Swiss-Prot record:
Keywords carried by this UniProt record: DNA replication, Endonuclease, Hydrolase, Nuclease
Coiled coil start-end: none
GO biological process: DNA replication
Entry's Gene Ontology molecular function annotations: endonuclease activity
Protein name: Probable replication endonuclease from prophage-like region 1
Native organism: Salmonella typhi
Pfam families: Phage_GPA
Amino acid sequence: MSHADMNNCSGFNEAAAAFSWNSPKKAINPYLDLAEVAPVSALSNLITLYAADNEQEQLRREALSDQVWERYFFNESRDPVQREMEQDKFISRAKLAHEQQRFNPDMVILADVNAQPSHISRPLMQRIEYFSSLGRPKAYSRYLRETIKPCLERLEHVRDSQLSTSFRFMASHEGLDGLLILPEMSQDQVKRLSTLVAAHMSMCLDAACGDLYATDDVKPEEIRKTWEKVAAETLRLDVIPPAFEQLRRKRNRRKPVPYELIPGSLARMLCADWWYRKLWKMRCEWREEQLRAVCLVSKKASPYVSYEAMMHKREQRRKSLEFFRSHELVNEDGDTLDMEDVVNASSSNPAHRRNEMMACVKGLELIAEMRGDCAVFYTITCPSRFHSTLNNGRPNPTWTNTTVRQSSDYLVGMFAAFRKAMHKAGLRWYGVRVAEPHHDGTVHWHLLCFMRKKDRRTITALLRKFAIREDREELGNNTGPRFKSELINPRKGTPTSYIAKYISKNIDGRGLAGEISKETGKSLRDNAEYVNAWASLHRVQQFRFFGIPGRQAYRELRLLAGQAARQQGDKKAGAPVLDNPRLDAILAAADAGCFATYIMKQGGVLVPRKYHLIRTAYEINEEPTAYGDHGIRIYGIWSPIAEGKICTHAVKWKMVRKAVDVQEAAADQGACAPWTRGNNCPLAENLNQHEKDKSADGDTRTDITCMDDKELHDYLHSMGKKEHRELAARLRLVKPKRRKDHKQRITEHQRQQLVYELKSRGFDGSEKEVDLLLRGGSIPSGAGLRIFYRNQRLQEDDKWRDLY
């Protein structure tokens, strides 16, 4: 372009710039130029609000649409793709949980605990949650791995030992699969299961009989073969059939087969009630052994027995007491005896039982002094393989899944072998044996034995040999954990004082409320209830006397003496009852309660039973049992030096339910009287219906306001279920009287003195403070103490006034 052209172009641009609409536009640069902001106006604000509302409405509609699609279209039942996606999600979560468990063994242990039945998992989870709340992860993990995991492993071994092969075979029958979960069942479930077992035994009997009884010509041996087939089915359930020892086949049988026992045995094996008792006992024992396996029976949890076994024993005792109070004994003449009084007067009363044994031990002590014998106190314990739990509450690694019953059988077998060896060596002793539980329920024995002084070392060495011969390597040179012996020094205490503590703490804990057990840390009196529940559950004989005449003849003689005293009437006290003077001397000794004289008159200690002068007589019961057989009952006493027997149970008593109270019977009369035994109408309606009659005739209810604490306690415990319901209804209908505020009355001088003392202690001494103290309140005085006014004195203590 030439210079002239450029001048012409520049002139054109200058001419164009003279107009605004023709000026050149500026180039846009977003990095350098600021964006122009639109002016704010009312219209722009309104448009912005409408846009926001439309956006929120659009989001709400989209969310609602998604919910509708997910509910009706994209769910597992309608959309297979969605279902497959959900399944893949669950599988991935399960794989993730499995991987976490594989790398975290604690979660595996927790899952195993939660998979256990409730009677196992609930108490274990409570302990696990406690350790988890401590905030110590290492201790929590160590507790799971070192305590909970071994407990679960031991639990599986115990279950395998309980369910034998034959027992599992019986559970494979139709309807009997509940046998596999027998420890987890309740009483109602066990009752239903026992009915099914009885029905199965009935079918076995029908199959065994076949056409055997089509004719009357049936031999007793054929009936016995039928019984053997039913008994074999019973043995598969680990239950010994009735009369099994008498009826089973023996290679060298000396006596003829008692075929008359077969009907009663078959009747029991076909009875649902009999099976319920057997299965319930088995269930309780198996359940207790499972709780022992997981360390829930120990000094750290519940000593001697589990907590639920203790509660069951209390409930059983309560039901027995209600049964005794609702029944009475009636004879042919119409005389009645309250059944509760009869039970309390018998040896079932713990106080009578304790007194009788203490009198017997005292008699042995007097005889030993007369003979010049020495007394030795022994303690025998089972090997460590019988103990399930250590003293610290952790599982014992040497435990071999043995039961409490097996530990008792071990001691019985050991003692029988020792007595055989002792008699073979010509050694004799007499005394008493006490069976006690360790904190985990394992049995150990205490023996108080009397013997000749020259035989003491030999007998002690022989007993030590039998007590430690099993698992001898675990003891080493110290045999104290298994066997202890102590020669009783008369200067320190008598033999009776040694054994008195063990007798009392295993019966009712009389006189031991202040002593604490070193093993459990509880009072010996409180432990007595647990010990009795332990002995009842595992069927352990707590006390056993040996080398002396039987105590049942002693009881029958005392009963005979009481009957003779009532019949003699005006005769002189101490007059002979029996014609034979030797027998009458034994009767007099028993009546006086002197066991020493009774034993010596019977022939003395270490005398075989066949040489005792008086023995217990038995007879066959006239009335048959529910199974058709006739049992054996006590008749009285008899003696080989006198003819005939002496009956001490001449009067036949029959147990009947007590008669209904007349007032209760009248309450159920009228047009609304029920046609059944009980009245199912609401109690409030009954009370309203008879309220007018009672108000007109006078209130015949017992006035409990005039009773003391003991009478009120006895009255409330003697009430039946109906009386309890009526009392509860009366309490709901009658409005309780509000107790007026108690305010102490003081003189003006005492009030001024109280105000002065309050001001001296730094209080205001106002009328409000004085009125609060006079009404029984208290005022905080600092350091956790409170002041209160009692007996015209201002006192200060950290306890509330009502606790005094």
